[in-house]
Amino acid sequence: MIDRYSRPELTAIWSDGARFALWLEIELAVCEAMEARGRVPTGSAATVRERATGKLDPKRILEIEAITRHDVIAFLTHVEELAGEPARWLHLGMTSSDVLDTALDGTFIPAGAHLMVHWLSLIHI
């Protein structure tokens, strides 16, 4: 997004930081489901959540992406830097599209809601 043409609230929703935070939540939700089915060691998701939530560094992820040339691999590599061994259970059984498409859908909802509230505020009855 071009900042000078964007509402600050929308710039925040579409920022790299927000995108990567949403990716983490998606990965953790799947990891928790895998734990419930006995496919992942119990506590893996909680450990990753504790060690990585609020600590993601978008600049570091982009640095890794410049090397790997793959956005999701760069993200997962950075999460592993933060969380260590339990992060290896993230992305199990998933494709990059599973994360990207779900996150895109999850971004449209708050962005659309913000725009609707804004547009409705412009209507004078």
Language-model regions: role of each:
Residues 1-123:
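A helix-coil-helix interface module used to build multimeric assemblies
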